[in-house]
Amino acid sequence: MRKIIAGVFIFVFLISNLYAALVAEVTTGVIQKPLVTVVSDNVVDQFPQQVNSVIVADLNHNAKLQANDTIKYEIKQKQNIPWKSLKSDYVVLTKYTNNSYNNYTVEVQILKRNDTSYLQAITYKNINVSLMRTLAHKISNYVYQKLTGNQGFFLTKLAYVKVSNPYARYGRLYELIISDYDGYNKHVVLRQTDNPIATPSWSNDGRYIVYSSYSGGSMGVYTLEIATGKVTRITNYKGINSSPSLSPDGKEIALALSKGYSDQTNIYIMNLSTKALKRITINGINTAPKFSPNGQSIVFTSDREGRPNIYVASVNSKYPQSSILSTKIHQAYEPNYTPDGKNIVFMNQSSRTSGTQIADFNLANGSVTNITNGKADSSPTVSPYGDMVAYISTNTRGYSSLDMVSLDGDNHFNIETADNGNILIQSPSWSPKNF
């Protein structure tokens, strides 16, 4: 039984070792994105340069805009903007007033080519330099929302697991880390030795993380209160207790249980107040459940037809019943709904390659599109406003990294890389909102 339980925790590691030749199946169109140039009225002071650099990075980490900065220009008035040389669609003009030591007022103006008026303007007062990155992300959210009509995600967080000495018999260190969406401001919120931490998932209010762990001789599902660090065990069933996911209203969790010493797991929904269970599946290995945004259905992975694939079940069915998502998909794992409920992002293993990539399934037309082209990409998690997907990429040397890709597959960037094989990065989970 212990071997079965251990197998659940090394699932991500096993799939990361699929290194056969890859035939890329990326189908993305090239769309010209509006160019935003970020300029400042102060090119000498370090603080404005730092803020503007973060804004530019933010505005390049999405599917709708591209950005650059022009440090060589010191522009104090909109009339002085060199539109011809900039070739920009928009300019974000930032004006910095040093009120006192380490304290600034920052005015932000958005201008459009061939328009003499400000599109939008906002002022941030009494900003301490220690809040540099927070200010920059706030400005980025403001600019992104004004230019695209969509809410920005630049103040969101990522939770993920870092494992040191993963192959040692003893002394394996598991750390649950929360960082800014771009990997900065990392904080270890939970640390355990030789007791795995797996599949963290946020509550919708951002106050809790649920996760599974092997502790005290058995598996269980736990909650971690982020503000206090308080850990509470919420399941204690025999056998496998894994893959918890909170419902949108926070009143229930979906999870995988074996309910005894069996190699089969089924999906259940647990009422967190009463601890009552409702069974959703029967037969096979069923795991990795995720609620739809409206809380009315669940997607999960099952091998009931001989190979892993994605299935959908209603949470309101009187009896356990579910259906395969699509016959177009050969093998699939770890499904996640996009926030609008229109797409499902998952780990894809096509019939043409033994490698795994992150793919997008369009629920309206049934199309499947790979958005990454790595040899072992896994564990996708979607940003709360749907523009980006974070995931784990493992190279042919076995080194893992936490990466990000836009939902259209166009923009890729790295968040954190394990620089040797003695560290693994696993199980990213995107926060449900900005902080």
UniProtKB/Swiss-Prot annotation:
The keyword Cell division applies. Keywords: Cell cycle, Cell division, Periplasm, Signal. The keyword Transmembrane helix does not apply. It comes from the Bacteria. InterPro entries: 6-blade_b-propeller_TolB-like, PD40, Tol-Pal_TolB. GO terms for biological process: cell division; protein import. GO terms for cellular component: periplasmic space. Residues 1-20 form the signal peptide. Pfam families: PD40 (PF07676). It is found in: Periplasm. Part of the Tol-Pal system, which plays a role in outer membrane invagination during cell division and is important for maintaining outer membrane integrity. Belongs to the TolB family. The Tol-Pal system is composed of five core proteins: the inner membrane proteins TolA, TolQ and TolR, the periplasmic protein TolB and the outer membrane protein Pal. They form a network linking the inner and outer membranes and the peptidoglycan layer. This is Tol-Pal system protein TolB. It comes from Francisella tularensis subsp. tularensis (strain WY96-3418).
